[in-house]
Amino acid sequence: MRRAGGLSRAGHGAAPAAGVMRAAASAFFAGYHCFTSVAALLALPFSAAVLVAEAAAAAPAPAPVALRALAARLRAVFAAAGFPPSPFFALLEAKLSQTVFTFAAALPFALTFLLLAKACVAAMLRDDAASPRRHRRRRWPGVAALPACGAVARAYPAVLATHVLGAFLMLSANAAAFSLLLLAFGAADLLGLTSRAWTLALSAAGAVAYSLAVGVAAVVCNLAVVVAATEPGCAGHAAVLRACVAIRGRVSTALALALPTNLGMAAAEALFGLRVVAQRRRDGRLAPAVAAEAFSIAYIHAVCVVLEIIVACVFYRSCKRSEADELRELEPEEKGDLQA
C-alpha cells in the first residue's frame, strides 16, 4: 500500500512553473555575458531570418509566389476535405500557409545557427558529474564560460537528428488534428447540425483542441532537443521518448513555461512589423535609423530564443531531480516489503 501511495505522487514533485522561471532567470543573469554572446553570434541570424520571412509572408501585395501557391493548395485541400466555408477556416488557412512559408524560409538557419545555439546553451547548463562537490550541491550552478567548440560539435549530430524527427512529429500532429476536425464536422453534417451557431461552436472547439495538440507536440519536440543536447548517446526517437516521460503529469507546467518566451517572440515579431516593415512600405526605402531599430528588434527576438532554451534546460533538470527523489522515496519501501 505504501508503494502504491508513493507511485501515486509521481509527476507532482517537479518545481512549479514560477519556480522554474525564477531559476531560469537566475541562470540567465548568472551567465549574462555568455548567454548574450550566444544570442548575438548564433541566435541572431535565425531571428533575423524569421522576422524577414514573417514580414514577407504578411505582406498584403505582392505576396511571394510560393506563399500564393501554398495558400491555394491549402484552400483546395480544405474544400476537398469537406470543411464548411467559415471565417475560422479562412483565418486558419491564411495563418497555416504563413507558418509553413516562414518555417521553410528559415529552415537553413534553424538547422545551423538555432541548433548550434541550443547545443551551446545546453552545454553551459549541463550537470557535470565530475565537478567538485561544492558545485554539485548548488541547486542551479552558475555559468563560468562558453563551452568548448568540441563539446558543441559532438552534441550537434544528435541535436540535428532529434530536430528533424521533431519536425516530422509536428507535421503528424497537425495532420492528426485536421483529421479529427474533419471527423467532427462530418459527424455534425450527418446529424444535421449545419446551422451557423453549430458551425461556430465546432470551430471554436476545434481551435482550442488544435492549439492544445500542437502546443503539447511543440513542447515535447523542444524538450527532446534539450534531452539530445544534454544526455550523451540519446538522440532521435530515444530523446523524444525521454521527453514524453519527463513531462508525464507536468503538461500544464510545460505549457505555462512555454508561454512567456513565445509571447516575447510574438511581441518582437509584431514590433518588427510595426516599426520596420510599415516604415519601409511608407518611405519606400530602409533608412539607417530604421535599420538600426531592425537590428535591435532582431536581437531582442534572439534573446527570447535563448531564454526559451534556458527555460527548457532548467525544466528538464527539475524533472530529472523529481524522478530521482521519487526513486529514493521508493527504495526504503521496497526494502521493507522484501524484509516482510
Task: Label each PLM-derived region with a short phrase.
Residues 1-340:
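Hydrophobic alpha-helical membrane segments
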